[in-house]
Amino acid sequence: MTYAYLFKYIIIGDTGVGKSCLLLQFTDKRFQPVHDLTIGVEFGARMVNIDGKQIKLQIWDTAGQESFRSITRSYYRGAAGALLVYDITRRETFNHLTSWLEDARQHSSSNMVIMLIGNKSDLESRRDVKREEGEAFAREHGLIFMETSAKTACNVEEAFINTAKEIYRKIQQGLFDVHNEANGIKIGPQQSISTSVGPSASQRNSRDIGSNSGCC
């Protein structure tokens, strides 16, 4: 299937926060309760519709172990979007967000869109990180924020698509050089219009990116 743009994503965060499960739920609409640890990187892709345009999302799921951090860093380059994931039942995964964020911003484009995800919202009774803490971290660092459940699929679709909406908004504003694939964006065969157009009504509508969305 042809597409207007290809956006490259990277999923980052500690081991066991559910990165691979989020990818599987988004691409295959299924949950795998037992998942082998990611070694290096895994890959998935899916087409979505943003503002009437077909967008191909190319998603790289990275290993969370410290021993693979150098490999992960190489994938930041050329990523238009990042999903930074923590587990709401494990505070240490939230405490490590600053380190992951520093890595991401040091090795990526300054315009990369970062979505902060508090995963495993289905385990409310075991919650160790308040939603308000995630919201505050996102505000402080200029991130989009959502809580998700890879198990129930709650907000999984929205997290990936809202990240794409924000990337597309930046394209419309001229913040991304879409002719430089190092920015994680590739022009597809569908896309022939100039990317230097100003904000449109549809673009302005896309700014409602759901940072306050509830879960289930």
Curated annotation (Swiss-Prot):
Obligatory cofactor(s) = Mg(2+)
Which residue ranges does the UniProt annotation give for the motif Switch 1? 37-42
Locus of motif Switch 2: 63-72
Residues binding GDP are G16, V17, G18, K19, S20, C21, N119, D122, A150, K151
Question: For this protein, what reaction is catalysed?
Answer: GTP + H2O = GDP + phosphate + H(+)
Annotated SUPFAM superfamilies: P-loop containing nucleoside triphosphate hydrolases
One GO-annotated biological process of the protein = protein transport
* Amino acids binding GTP: G16, V17, G18, K19, S20, C21, T38, G64, N119, K120, D122, A150, K151
Q: What sections of the sequence does the record tag as coiled-coil?
A: none
The main place the protein resides is membrane
The domain of life for this entry's organism is Eukaryota
Question: Its topology with respect to the membrane?
Answer: Lipid-anchor
Keywords (A to Z) from UniProt: Cell membrane, Cytoplasmic vesicle, Endoplasmic reticulum, ER-Golgi transport, Golgi apparatus, GTP-binding, Hydrolase, Lipoprotein, Magnesium, Membrane, Metal-binding, Nucleotide-binding, Phosphoprotein, Prenylation, Protein transport, Transport
Subunit: Interacts (in GTP-bound form) with GARIN4 (via N-terminus). Interacts (in GTP-bound form) with GARIN5A. Interacts (in GTP-bound form) with GARIN1B. Interacts with VPS39 and VPS41.
Q: State its role.
A: The small GTPases Rab are key regulators of intracellular membrane trafficking, from the formation of transport vesicles to their fusion with membranes. Rabs cycle between active GTP-bound and inactive GDP-bound states. In their active state, drive transport of vesicular carriers from donor organelles to acceptor organelles to regulate the membrane traffic that maintains organelle identity and morphology. Regulates the compacted morphology of the Golgi. Promotes cytosolic DNA-induced innate immune responses.
The name under which this protein is listed is: Ras-related protein Rab-2B
Question: Which organism encodes this protein?
Answer: Homo sapiens
